[in-house]
Every structure is written in structure tokens, then in C-alpha cells.
Amino acid sequence: MVRIRLTRMGKKKQPFYRIVVVDQRKRRDGAYIESLGYYDPIKDPYILNVDVDKAVDWILKGAQPSQTVKNLLRKAGVFKKVDEIKRTKKKEENQ
């Protein structure tokens, strides 16, 4: 199964994270399929940069986000776009 999760980058006591698509059997910092953005929790306010189109594409393909990534993607507005796409597909099927 393919997951969307965080991989830790940065140096000791100064982490930042990449949001990546990875096979769930891989290690946390192992090889990943594609990078979707990054998250820096240390900055005030935090920095969140997500390629929304890529994230939507992977979610529609069936990639499962971790709970933390799900919360971050919700803040970035990814799930609103996914819902819109699913609604338009249902309307097209019904007509």
C-alpha cells in the first residue's frame, strides 16, 4: 500500500519534514516515490508548502495519508479539492 507521510530532514533539534509518497514497508527516512512538499514546525508561524495538484492526484489513486499528514493536507485545502472532484464525477455518472 502507498502512504503519504512525513520524512525527517534537518539537523539535531532543528527538524523539518518533507511530505512524501512512499511504500508503507519502507523506513521512515528511506527511498520515496515522490515529494509533495515540506513542513517546517520550528518557524513562527510554521511553514507548510504542498503541491496541491500532486497531492489530490495521489489521494484519488488511493494513497493513504498518515494522521499527521491528513491534518496538514486539510489545512492546505487538499481535501476540499478532492471532495469537489468526487462530487463532479458523481453528477456526471448520474446524468
Curated annotation (Swiss-Prot):
Listed GO CC annotations: cytoplasm; small ribosomal subunit
GO biological process: translation
MF terms (GO), sorted A to Z: structural constituent of ribosome
InterPro entries: Ribosomal_bS16 (IPR000307), Ribosomal_bS16_CS (IPR020592), Ribosomal_bS16_dom_sf (IPR023803)
Pfam families attached to this UniProt entry: Ribosomal_S16 (PF00886)
UniProt keyword list: Ribonucleoprotein, Ribosomal protein
Family under the similarity heading: Belongs to the bacterial ribosomal protein bS16 family.
The protein, known as: Small ribosomal subunit protein bS16
Organism annotation: Thermosipho melanesiensis (strain DSM 12029 / CIP 104789 / BI429)
